[in-house]
C-alpha cells in the first residue's frame, strides 16, 4: 500500500475518526485507525465496538491496500509534518513509512484483517434535518443526561421521532430537559442514543445550514454529515415516562431576566464547594426574588426584582448547579418559572412558552425532615 495525501486534509480526517477510538481498548487493533486506499480515495475508520466513525477523502493512490496504524502516533506525526503532501507506504516487513518534506517516520503497522468490521446496521432512512437545528436541540438538553450507569437508559438521550416532529429528552433523576421541533418525517420510532455519540456528533457535524441525515432502527442509529458517517449502537431499556412527571398546574408564575438571575446565583455559589454543599434558599414574592445560602465558608443574601410575578409567594430550595445549568443552556433573555409549591418540580420555559421545557427538582431543607 502506498498513497499521497494533502497534510491538512489527512490530519482533519484522522482527528475526526479518532473520536471513536478508546485509548485502552480490549482489542489492541481498535487503538488504531483502519485505512483503505483504492481508486482515488482513502477511507479511514475508528471503532470502539459501540460507535464507529468513517470518512473518505481524496488521495493519490500509488499502490492500493489496507492497514491499521496507531491513532495517537499517526495523528501526532501527520500534524507535525511540514505543509504539503504526506506519503504513507507499507513495506513487506509490516512497517509503515510516513514521510513529508524532509521528515520521515517509521512505525509498526497492524494487520488489517484483525480489524473488526462495522456491523451492517440495516437502519432505515428516517429524516434529514439542518445541522444547526439538531445542534441546538442536543446542546439545550444533553447537560441533563445521567452520569449514573445504574440506569443505563438515562445515560443517553431519548429521540421521539413521530410524523412531523422530533422530540429530544434527557434526565438524571434531579432534572429533566425536553425540546421539540417540527421536521419532515413519516417514521414513528423511539430510540435512546448514547450521550458520547451525540457529543462526538456535535464536533463533527457541518455548519448550521448543512444537512445531517439520520437513519435508525431498533438497534442502531447512523448520522451522515460533513463527509462523515457515525454509526452507534442504541441503549436498550425503558426510558422514564417523562410526560407523566410534568406538572399540569401552577400556583406561582415568575418571569425573570436570565442574566440577572444567573449573576445572583453565581454570587451565592461562592460559599458552596464540592465538600461544603447547601441548597440555595430562594424566596419568590411580588416585588423581589431573594436568594440566601449559608455554609461554613460564610453566608450570602442577595435579591433582584422579577420582571413579572403572579400567584402565591413561595420559598423553595435549589441545587445551585442544576438551576444554573437550566438558565445557561436555555440561551434565553427571559425565562418563566412555574411553581406548584415548595416540594413540587419547578418548570422553566422560555418567555414565549414554546420549544422546550426544563424541570428542576427542589431540595428539602434539613429542618423540614
Where are these regions (language model features)?
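Structural preference for solvent-exposed beta-strand-turn elements
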Residues: 1-369
Amino acid at each position: 500500500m502506498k498513497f499521497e495525501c494533502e497534510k491538512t486534509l489527512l490530519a482533519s480526517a484522522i482527528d475526526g475518526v479518532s473520536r471513536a477510538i478508546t485509548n485502552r481498548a480490549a482489542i489492541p487493533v481498535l487503538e488504531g485507525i483502519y485505512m483503505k486506499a483504492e481508486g482515488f480515495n482513502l477511507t479511514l475508520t475508528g471503532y470502539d465496538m459501540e460507535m464507529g466513525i468513517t470518512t473518505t477523502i481524496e488521495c493519490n493512490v500509488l499502490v492500493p491496500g489496507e492497514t491499521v496504524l496507531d491513532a495517537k502516533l499517526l495523528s501526532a506525526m501527520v500534524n507535525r509534518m511540514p505543509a504539503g503532501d504526506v506519503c504513507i507506504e507499507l513495506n513487506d516487513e509490516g512497517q509503515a513509512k510516513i514521510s513529508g518534506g524532509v521528515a520521515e517516520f517509521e512505525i509498526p503497522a497492524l494487520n488489517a484483517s484483525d480489524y473488526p468490521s462495522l456491523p451492517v446496521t440495516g437502519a432505515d432512512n428516517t429524516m434529514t434535518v439542518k445541522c444547526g437545528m439538531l445542534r441546538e436541540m442536543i446542546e439545550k438538553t444533553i447537560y441533563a443526561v445521567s452520569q449514573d450507569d445504574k440506569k443505563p437508559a438515562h445515560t443517553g438521550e431519548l429521540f421521539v421521532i413521530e410524523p412531523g416532529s422530533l422530540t429530544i429528552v434527557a434526565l438524571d433523576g434531579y432534572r429533566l430537559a425536553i425540546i421539540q421541533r417540527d421536521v419532515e418525517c413519516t417514521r414513528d420510532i423511539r430510540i435512546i442514543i448514547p450521550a458520547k455519540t451525540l457529543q462526538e456528533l456535535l464536533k463533527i457535524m457541518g455548519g448550521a445550514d448543512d444537512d445531517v441525515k439520520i437513519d435508525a432502527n431498533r438497534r442502531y442509529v447512523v448520522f451522515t454529515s460533513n463527509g462523515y458517517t457515525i454509526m452507534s449502537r442504541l441503549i436498550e431499556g425503558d426510558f422514564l415516562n417523562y410526560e407523566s412527571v410534568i406538572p399540569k398546574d401552577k400556583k406561582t408564575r415568575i418571569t425573570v431576566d436570565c442574566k440577572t438571575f444567573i449573576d445572583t446565583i453565581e454570587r451565592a455559589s461562592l460559599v458552596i464547594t464540592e465538600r461544603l454543599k447547601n441548597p440555595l434558599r430562594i424566596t419568590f414574592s411580588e416585588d423581589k426574588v431573594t436568594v440566601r445560602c449559608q455554609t461554613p465558608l460564610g453566608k450570602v443574601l442577595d435579591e433582584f426584582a422579577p420582571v413579572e410575578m403572579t400567584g402565591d409567594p413561595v420559598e423553595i430550595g435549589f441545587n445551585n448547579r442544576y438551576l444554573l445549568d437550566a438558565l445557561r443552556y436555555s440561551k434565553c433573555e427571559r425565562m418563566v418559572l412555574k411553581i406548584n409549591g415548595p416540594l413540587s418540580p419547578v418548570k422553566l420555559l422560555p418567555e414565549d412558552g414554546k420549544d422546550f421545557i426544563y424541570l428542576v427538582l427542589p431540595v428539602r431543607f434539613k429542618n423540614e425532615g
